Amino acid sequence: MTLPPGAPICRWIYKDEVVDIMPDDENVIGFTNMWYHEALAAKEKRTLSNGIDIYIFSLPYYVATKLEAVKGRGGDDWRWSHDFEDIIYILNYCPTFILTLQSGNVKLIEYLKKEFSDILCRSNISEEVECKLPYGEDDRTEYILDVMKGIVNL
């Protein structure tokens, strides 16, 4: 199995599985994220349907890493940001996201509160959110904005 051209720099084939591996040492792939080290320390184990165990970031840490990525490579127009799309996906399809924050790391929660507060001040945030929702779900824009407000108000 080989990776297609244009695959992300973090994509690898491991034991015949395609995986994205994000190192917390910037010397490995040339960059890192301020949240990778903590996210790796708090990783969660999942077992795939084929019996293989994998480790993933918890949702709050995943969103924090994506927020850092948007700031680093999202540019001024987030309608085109894949990282912002990932954040919107989590906020749209994980109704318990705010509950997962209530018992989490205080530093992480404060970071998320500040970042979502800043996001809500963006002049085009409604359009940016709507552009990242699946076709036909633009009515979810207000819901997503309310989730962001809920995070800020924790």
Regions found by a protein language model. Name each.
Residues 1-154:
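Compositionally biased terminal segments of proteins
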